[in-house]
Amino acid sequence: MEILDILILGSGPAALCLASELAKQDLNIKGISTKSPNEKWENTYGIWASELEELGLESLLSHRWCKTVSFFGDGENKKGDTPTKHNYDYGLINQEAFQNELLKKCKGIEWLNETAKEIKEKNKLSEVTCFSGLKINARLVIDASGHKSNFVKRPVQNEIAQQAAYGIVGKFTSPPVNKEQFVLMDFRPNHLNNEEKLSSPSFLYAMDLGNETFFVEETSLASYPALSQENLKKRLYKRLNSKGIEVSEIFHEENCLFPMNLPLPFKKQFVLGFGGAASMVHPASGYMVGSLLRRAPLLAQKLAIFLKEPQLSSLELASKGWEILWPYELTQRHKLYQYGLRRLMSFDESRLRSFFSNFFRLSTNEWVGFLTNTLPLPKLIYVMSKMFINSPLKVKLGMLKLN
């Protein structure tokens, strides 16, 4: 009977990021997934360029923008249309190049076209039974199949906030954003009536892709219940039409829906998670790729060390893995971000615009560190305190839950 060191569930970015690091560790590894790891990834992945530069991976960007802005005014006059300039480069990852780079590093790892039905701990090992009837034994199972994992256990939480987005890559009757411009957040509400302004806020995320092609996406940062794709599509078209812009050709439609505030998994369990299954989505932004790339190497190195101890069971290996993935520092940071997200979800569009306008008055290092989850805990506490002190009264009251 073959006993793997590690069996990975999934074949998306999280699975391949970790597998590409584990492949360096001289371990017996396989993966299983309903999709081939070679199947093209459809979603677009944006990232602050510095996150890839720090890892020497900036060549994976298909586009890079220096003109990065947001709009937090009311859109009613010149002042309300004034952009907030970020002066920080943003990039779009070339999905094909990113996927191929990871697959190249995963050479030697076989992926089986299987789906796990049940995972049991048996004689200190993990026995995975697939829907086909195939049984696979491994010392450790890592679920990197996404946030809908059936095997990673976490505290029950009824109200899970979701980030939802509907987007279009296409051509338009006139440019939806300026030439060579990237818009992180356009919260201007002047295309909405008073009743619509009372509903859960959303913003435009948009970029010039060149050759008269643009990506525009209506995004709800976090909402419970989630905004529907139909609602977001209507909002996007209304936003465009209010500027006299019509869609002339669609190359790709994007639909996004994922949880922003999943509780952290229990650390004492015999399955380890990674990516969405491990609650690694950043509650402040919804981003995860940078975190996957930064956190995979250490986890892979530590797991290789733990696996050298033959007496360790699946439960012990996974528990040690969870401690590496979610140490005290990262856990406390996550709690702070989740608190902030809960407060933002209670803000109407006016208060939310005021919050973000104030947020981007932080120094570049502070707001970038906040959005990329790279600030050490003491610095994060300092930045959040500074942000609160400098906030307008209505934002302070909202953060304190007093209004």
Q: Language-model segments: what does each one mean?
A:
Residues 1-14:
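Beta1/beta-strand and adjacent pyrophosphate-binding region of the FAD-binding site
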Residues 105-246:
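Predominantly flavin-linked oxidoreductase catalytic cores and closely associated redox partners
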Residues 14, 37, 148:
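Conserved Rossmann-like nucleotide-cofactor binding loop
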Residues 17, 21-75:
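N-terminal FAD cofactor-binding segment of flavoenzymes
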Residues 300-403:
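C-terminal helical "tail/cap" subdomain of flavin- and related membrane-associated enzymes
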Residues 49-114, 119-123:
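A conserved beta-strand/loop capping segment in the N-terminal third of enzymes
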Residues 116, 198, 204, 220-302:
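FAD/FMN-dependent oxidoreductases across multiple families
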Residues 9, 143-144, 273-275:
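Redox-cofactor binding/interface segments in oxidoreductases and associated redox assembly factors
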